[in-house]
């Protein structure tokens, strides 16, 4: 489900979520599913032997399956604001709470945007430690198996296979063409990919290349927002705070990564949550805002197949 579908929204919380979606576009594409604060996830690591083809009256192939489970604990993200009594008591002079309500609305909008930006960043760069959720770049690091950290029921070798080191600077036509070949191959590794995640710098270069090759397009996402596409796959452009431009290839420190994702509640990439967007308003808002208003999102990353995600790292501009 999308974040607006999984959240319990009122008129005011729906308005705040709309602002979050405008500022943090990854929320428009990410899939969320309801799950417990501590839940077991089962990655699809089933193994089968032989063939399903059989002769008439012959026994069907039988494979005994043992699930590989992993516990996913939700990371807790939340902020709250309070308005000092000195502001509240202005109503004694004006006789109307309208000014205070406008001030409160502005602060709530700012708070929603701040929360959304931090969560969007951590969807990519969350370390899975120090109270942060696990982000895509920490789940699949730019490293061989020895440099990976096993997570979500996958082995370090499986995680390493989800990364491809491009090792190209996209400043010549030859390098750009070679990169596009790599990108097409990687798209083939992620069946039904529905998002290409890039930072603003690589996004601009990718569109330049795509237009030259006739692979650029445009569509409208489920929120009615126009989005550019590469070979019909939406390009989600994120800030460098989410996908850095200072990754290293061992020599240069101006590299970045691209992520091909199949967002799906089952057998894809999604985010567990038991809250969606959880908003608690000021008490007695219609009289005048007082006390504390709070916004929270409880979530964490879930990946269920190795073909749901591909990282292309060591890309220079």
For the regions a language model picked out, list residue spans one by one.
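Flexible, glycine/threonine- and acidic-rich loop/arm segments that mediate assembly and lattice contacts
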Residues: 1-251, 255-257, 262-317
């Amino acid at each position: 489900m999308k974040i607006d579908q999984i959240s319990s929204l009122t008129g005011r919380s729906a308005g705040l979520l709309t602002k979050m979606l405008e500022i943090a576009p990854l929320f428009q594409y990410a899939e969320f599913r309801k799950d417990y604060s501590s839940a077991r996830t089962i990655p699809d690591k089933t193994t089968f032997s032989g063939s399903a083809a059989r002769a008439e009256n012959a026994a069907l192939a039988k494979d005994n399956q043992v699930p590989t489970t992993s516990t996913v604990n939700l990371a807790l993200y939340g902020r709250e604001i309070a308005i000092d009594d000195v502001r509240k008591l202005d109503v004694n002079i004006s006789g109307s709470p309208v000014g205070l309500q406008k001030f409160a609305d502005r602060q709530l909008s700012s708070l929603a945007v701040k929360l959304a930006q931090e969560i969007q960043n951590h969807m990519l760069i969350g370390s899975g430690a120090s109270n942060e959720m696990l982000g895509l770049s920490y789940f699949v690091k730019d490293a061989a198996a020895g440099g990976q950290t096993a997570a979500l029921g996958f082995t370090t070798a499986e995680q390493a296979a989800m990364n491809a080191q491009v090792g190209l600077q996209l400043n010549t036509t030859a390098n750009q063409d070679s990169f596009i070949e790599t990108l097409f191959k990687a798209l083939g590794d992620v069946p039904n990919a529905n998002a290409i995640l890039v930072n603003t710098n690589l996004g601009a270069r990718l569109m330049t290349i795509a237009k030259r090759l006739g692979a650029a397009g445009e569509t409208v996402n489920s929120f009615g927002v126009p989005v550019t596409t590469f070979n019909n796959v939406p390009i989600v452009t994120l800030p460098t705070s989410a996908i850095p431009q200072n990754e290293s290839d061992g020599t240069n420190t101006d590299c970045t990564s691209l992520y091909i994702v199949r967002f799906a509640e089952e057998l894809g990439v999604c985010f567990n949550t038991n809250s969606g967007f959880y908003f608690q308003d000021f008490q007695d808002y219609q009289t005048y805002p007082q006390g504390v208003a709070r916004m929270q999102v409880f979530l964490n990353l879930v990946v269920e197949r190795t073909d749901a995600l591909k990282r292309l790292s060591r890309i220079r501009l």
